[in-house]
């Protein structure tokens, strides 16, 4: 049945169908005859093999094997031009020489005339790695020479023309050269600049901590000479420079004499009546007089303003009465009390007694600093108050009905004075022997409004209450 269907006369003719008509590679062998019976069991396979043999037969002549020389080389036009220039004896070549080199080396460009020469010309003119060299007169010919830029010899990776690192640009090359020069100069000047840098920093530090700088707004003493000045806690010492009569810039004076911790401790441990005078500290600004005040860090409740804590008389203290304070409540806008200097104080007093300027440090336990143990001395009655602690426009003599002499009155303590004045009772805390019949008193001296205003939260104004 199978043989009747396919009507194969010779079973050996199964493998005779040639793949190549000219060369019969699959010839019939004796072994193929024994395969006729088992292959007849698979009719589809037999039909497939016959159809495959027939289908591939007629198309073989239209697929000729292309020679290797006709394949396009895997090089760019820049690589081809570079090859031509580098193979030239003088490393320069004309345009026709580039054409000839490419056609001799690569036969693909010999037969393929599809505009590759135009591409060569474009690459020569557009790429900066190729430099046009004018032709010398000694060598006759046509066309200029083309050469490579000296900086473009390494534009291919490892000498391989298949890979180019990046597009060559002269701007990048110039920039790289400048960077190299800067790096070389930086390396050469590196040790010198490192040696000069500490000197410059040292100069800056010396200028910032120079003792010649005037300390106006700062509390800490930046001078290295003031070893005893308080630098740890700014609240412990509030310093305002006093004024010298001569406005001379001081040479390095140890400004910590009246502001040191030792002086504060001696004032606290000394008896209440013995108040040591503060030495005069010269200052650059000689405009507004002011007094140095020492505040301790513990004085929260018993610190008063300068007008009431600091006083002066011929023996060492000034006190103020309620009546005088009530008289001058509206005439004194400022709460700063400040004598200008010790020399003026001693020159204005005609009784010949010394008037030391005192500054007090009120501790937390000291509530009555000025006691009744202060000396009372009477002077001549017609002597008016010293004009150096008064305002120029508000002298005592201008007040009618009151004669202010130099008779001194003392109070039992400062706390009692302020309590009575705050309650508005003028005569409750004053005994009969404290206020004389002619109502003479020595009032607290006040100056013009100071430009250095005390920003301490512990200072109270006598005229407020």
From Swiss-Prot:
Q: Where in the cell is it found?
A: Nucleus
**Which Gene Ontology BP terms does the record give?**
anatomical structure morphogenesis; cell differentiation; mesoderm development; positive regulation of DNA-templated transcription; positive regulation of transcription by RNA polymerase II; regulation of DNA-templated transcription; regulation of transcription by RNA polymerase II
Q: Which residues bind DNA?
A: 72-166
UniProt keyword annotations, A-Z:
Activator, Developmental protein, DNA-binding, Nucleus, Transcription, Transcription regulation
Annotated region (Disordered) at 174-196, 219-258, 339-385
For this UniProt entry, which segments traverse the membrane? none
Q: Where is the composition biased (Polar residues)?
A: 230-258, 352-383
Q: Under the cellular component aspect of Gene Ontology, which terms does the record hold?
A: nucleus
Mind telling me which SUPFAM superfamilies this protein's record contains? Winged helix' DNA-binding domain
Q: In which tissues is it expressed?
A: After the mid-blastula transition, expressed in the dorsolateral mesoderm but not within the dorsal blastopore lip. During gastrulation and neurulation, expressed within the dorsal mesoderm and the lateral border of the neural plate but not within the dorsal midline. In neurula stage embryos, expressed throughout the entire somite-forming mesoderm, at the border between mesoderm and ectoderm but not within the notochord, neuroectoderm or lateral plate mesoderm.
Give the residue range of the signal peptide: none
> By what name is this protein known?
Forkhead box protein C2-A
Q: What is the organism field in this record?
A: Xenopus laevis (African clawed frog)
């Amino acid at each position: 049945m199978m043989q009747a269907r396919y009507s194969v006369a010779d079973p050996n003719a199964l493998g005779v169908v040639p793949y190549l008509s000219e060369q019969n590679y699959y010839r019939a062998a004796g072994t193929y005859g024994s395969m006729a019976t088992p292959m007849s069991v698979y009719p589809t396979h037999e039909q497939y093999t016959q159809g495959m043999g027939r289908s591939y037969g007629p198309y073989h002549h239209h697929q000729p094997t292309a020679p290797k020389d006709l394949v396009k080389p895997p090089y760019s036009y820049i690589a081809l031009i570079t090859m031509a220039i580098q193979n030239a004896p003088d490393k320069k070549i004309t345009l026709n020489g580039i054409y000839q080199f490419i056609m001799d080396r690569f036969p693909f460009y010999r037969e393929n005339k599809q505009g590759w020469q135009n591409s060569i010309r474009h690459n020569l003119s557009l790429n900066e790695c190729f430099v046009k060299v004018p032709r010398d007169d000694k060598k006759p010919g046509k066309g200029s020479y083309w050469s490579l830029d000296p900086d473009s010899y390494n534009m291919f990776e490892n000498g391989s023309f298949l890979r180019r690192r990046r597009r060559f640009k002269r701007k990048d090359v110039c920039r790289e050269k400048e960077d190299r020069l800067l790096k070389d100069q930086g390396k050469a000047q590196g040790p010198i600049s490192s040696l000069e840098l500490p000197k410059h920093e040292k100069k800056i530090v010396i200028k910032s901590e120079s003792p010649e700088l005037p300390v106006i707004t700062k509390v800490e003493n930046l001078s290295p000479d003031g070893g005893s000045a308080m630098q740890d806690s700014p609240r412990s010492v509030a310093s305002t420079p006093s004024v010298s009569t001569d406005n001379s810039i001081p040479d390095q004076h140890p400004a910590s004499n009246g502001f040191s911790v030792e002086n504060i401790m001696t004032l606290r441990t000394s008896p209440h009546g013995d108040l040591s005078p503060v030495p005069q500290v010269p200052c650059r600004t000689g405009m507004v007089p002011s007094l140095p005040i020492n505040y301790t860090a513990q004085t929260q409740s018993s610190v008063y303003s300068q007008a009431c804590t600091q006083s002066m008389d011929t023996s060492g203290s000034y006190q103020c009465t309620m009546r005088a304070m009530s008289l001058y409540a509206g005439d004194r806008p400022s709460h700063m009390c400040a004598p200008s200097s010790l020399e003026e104080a001693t020159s204005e007093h005609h009784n010949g007694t010394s008037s030391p300027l005192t500054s007090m440090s009120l501790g937390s336990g000291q509530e009555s600093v000025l006691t009744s143990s202060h000396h009372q001395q009477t002077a001549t009655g017609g002597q008016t108050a010293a004009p150096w602690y008064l305002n120029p426009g508000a002298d005592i003599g201008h007040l009618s009905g009151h004669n202010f002499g130099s008779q001194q009155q003392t109070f039992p303590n400062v706390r009692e004075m302020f309590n009575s004045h705050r309650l508005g009772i003028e005569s409750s805390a004053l005994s009969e022997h404290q206020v004389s019949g002619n109502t003479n008193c020595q009032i607290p001296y006040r100056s013009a409004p100071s430009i250095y205003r005390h920003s301490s939260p512990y200072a109270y104004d006598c005229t407020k209450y």
